[in-house]
């Protein structure tokens, strides 16, 4: 499929071409990326579950990152393996039959996909028009709109993928994902979509737009701080025997900080607890002490990387809003 006669729509075009040419002969199709793989036993189990539920249109697994060797890659792999199940089980419980599609490591009922998941060509030019770049969210939404179930089964292990080995490689991929997610705004108010799918789309948009909001918040805070340092404090703005002292609401500031940290760190804490309590998993990380040290190192490094990602993603959003198209750049898939 790298050499289709009409090589359009990239990965979505590969799937569409296969469905039109060969899909009629197969009850289901298993979608993988170039850097993902699954065990034979899991493939058989996925096919069994799909066959057992006639109303199920798509079954998504949780891919585990493997084969990372660089520091950044190992950081992603550790976070994926330890924190991933906590997030995944929460998402699966919340989504139910209205889950999402991640584009790979999933099995799809061919007839359901062919009948209901054809992607439109959006009016206008890229980055918001043209072919849909990030096809997976929209295909899941279209399947759900047609009445098919989309489910995320987190108990299906031996589902694997590789991750970009460096931050620069992640940012190259993020530029395309950012454009695809912002392009999804064209579908946010489409007729017939389920509420959960609209929330999937909105959360995907906010995954990148929030970086710009964070940057703007910091910029406004910096401007206000500079302004305050150059503005004399007026202790007597009106006639009074007593001065009017500046008010700083430290209690609310601390509350906001604690709540923000809880949102960021609580899932990681829960994952650490489950890792400690599961003896087999804990020993796989080298025991309780090494697991705890690894979590602390990951938290510190993630906090160091976060401002860099914020600036880069803010730039991505700005470029897209001003009409810059990312195209589809090749991705480095090894640590060399």
Label every PLM stretch briefly.
Residues 96, 163-336:
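Basic/Trp-rich segment in TM-proximal cytosolic loops or flexible interdomain/linker regions
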Residues 1-191:
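Internal catalytic domains of large membrane-associated glycosyltransferases
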């Amino acid at each position: 499929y790298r050499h289709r006669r009409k090589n359009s729509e990239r990965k979505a075009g590969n799937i569409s071409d296969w469905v039109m040419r060969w899909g009629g002969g197969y009850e289901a199709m298993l979608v993988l990326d170039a850097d993902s793989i699954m065990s034979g036993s899991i493939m058989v189990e996925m096919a069994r579950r799909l066959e057992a539920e006639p109303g199920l249109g798509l079954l998504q697994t949780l891919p585990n990152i493997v084969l990372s060797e660089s520091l950044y890659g190992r950081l992603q792999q550790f976070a994926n393996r330890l924190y991933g199940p906590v997030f995944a089980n929460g998402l699966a419980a919340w989504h139910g039959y209205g889950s999402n599609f991640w584009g790979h490591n999933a099995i799809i009922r061919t007839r359901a996909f062919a009948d209901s998941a054809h992607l439109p060509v959006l009016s206008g030019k890229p980055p918001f028009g043209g072919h849909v770049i990030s096809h997976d969210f929209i295909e899941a939404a279209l399947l759900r709109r047609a009445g098919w179930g989309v489910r995320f089964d987190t108990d299906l292990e031996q589902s694997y993928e590789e991750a970009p080995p460096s931050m620069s490689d992640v940012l190259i991929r993020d530029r395309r994902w950012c454009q695809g997610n912002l392009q999804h705004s064209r579908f946010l108010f489409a007729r017939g979509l389920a509420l959960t799918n609209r929330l999937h789309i909105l959360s995907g948009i906010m995954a990148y737009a929030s970086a710009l909001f964070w940057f703007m918040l910091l910029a406004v805070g910096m401007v206000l701080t500079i302004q305050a340092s150059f503005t004399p404090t007026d202790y007597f703005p009106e006639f009074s025997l007593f001065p009017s002292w500046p008010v700083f609401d430290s209690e609310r500031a601390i509350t906001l900080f604690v709540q923000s940290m809880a949102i960021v760190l609580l899932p990681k804490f829960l994952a650490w607890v489950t890792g400690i309590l599961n003896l087999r998993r804990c020993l796989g990380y080298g025991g309780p002490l090494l697991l705890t040290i690894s979590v602390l190192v990951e938290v510190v490094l993630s906090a160091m990387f976060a401002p860099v990602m914020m600036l880069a993603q803010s730039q991505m959003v700005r470029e897209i809003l001003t009409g810059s198209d990312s195209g589809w750049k090749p991705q480095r898939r090894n640590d060399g």
